[in-house]
Structure formats: structure tokens, C-alpha cells
Amino acid sequence: MAIRRILTVDNAADLATLKKISTPVEAVTDELRALMDDMLETMYDAPGIGLAAVQVGEPVRVIVMDLAREGEDKAPRYFVNPEILASSEDLQGYEEGCLSVPEYYDEVERPSKVTLRYMNYQGETVVEEAEGLFAVCIQHEMDHLEGVLFIDHLSRLRRDRAMAKVKKARRAA
């Protein structure tokens, strides 16, 4: 396993990659599992709760996630070719952050429940309902697979503020 560099919006080449639509994976192979293991190690190191493959420069439809609270045992989850089958009409607002938009958080409204289908680490197809933080996180990460960042859901003013804050934080570092 290896920690990979996380692409960020303040780098033009990184942003171009982050805006790419990720391609579906044909099968869960040992090579793909190695990528998922690297992604998980990278996410834990950052630290974060979710990471899409495109965020480490691999534009394929793969997500890793761990929603365990601090002090709880790790509970890694793997999502290959995830797709939303159904979404609730009711929305929930949640303050989101992103490893590719460092040091910036803002509220985004998303459906409060979604039903999704994906392949897991073993390549088995799973259908599952997500709600709460799980629903927020899976939708946020699935946006990455479409080349969409959480700040793209914000008004132009708030998006510009986010970019300015990220650039300022990078200069200070």
C-alpha cells in the first residue's frame, strides 16, 4: 500500500483531472484492489471519510469510505461503479468539506436518502439504501465521478470565496 498525492483545485492540472468524468471499471481485479488499498491509506492519512479515485489521479468509477467515528474500529467501505437507483424528494443540508478543496467547508443540500447499486471489494453486486451522513458522503463522492466538486453546488460568490480561501491557505503553508 502507498499514500498517493491528493489532487487539489488550486492546481490547474489537478483541477483539469478532477473535472474529468470517470470511466466504469470492467471487473474487480487484484490491480484494482491495490488501487483501493492505496486510496484507503491515503484517505486515512489525510485524514478524510471518503475519497474518489479521480482525486488521486485515477479517473475510474471507484470510491472508498470510512464513516467510523474517532475511537471506533475502522470500517472501510469500497464502491466500484456505484449508481443511484432512487433518491428521496426530501433534502437535507450538511456542511461538507473535501480533501481536494482543503480548508473550506460549506453547506450543500442533497436528497436525504438514496438507493444505490455498486460492486464491493470482492466484486459482488450490492444494492443498499443510504441515509444521513452515509447518503451525504456517497453523493459527494459520486459527484467526483462526474467531474463535479461540492463547491460547484454553491453560488458563484461562495465558490469564488472557496477558491480564494484555498489559495490563501496554500500560500500560508
Swiss-Prot record:
It holds the Pfam family Pep_deformylase. The keyword Phosphoprotein does not apply. GO terms for biological process: co-translational protein modification; translation. InterPro entries: Peptide_deformylase, Peptide_deformylase_sf. It catalyses: N-terminal N-formyl-L-methionyl-[peptide] + H2O = N-terminal L-methionyl-[peptide] + formate. Its EC number is 3.5.1.88. GO terms for molecular function: metal ion binding; peptide deformylase activity. The active site is at 141. Fe cation binds at residues 98, 140, 144. It comes from the Bacteria. Its cofactor is Fe(2+). Keywords: Hydrolase, Iron, Metal-binding, Protein biosynthesis. Belongs to the polypeptide deformylase family. HAMAP family: Pep_deformylase. Removes the formyl group from the N-terminal Met of newly synthesized proteins. Requires at least a dipeptide for an efficient rate of reaction. N-terminal L-methionine is a prerequisite for activity but the enzyme has broad specificity at other positions. This is Peptide deformylase. It comes from Caulobacter vibrioides (strain NA1000 / CB15N) (Caulobacter crescentus). The gene is def.
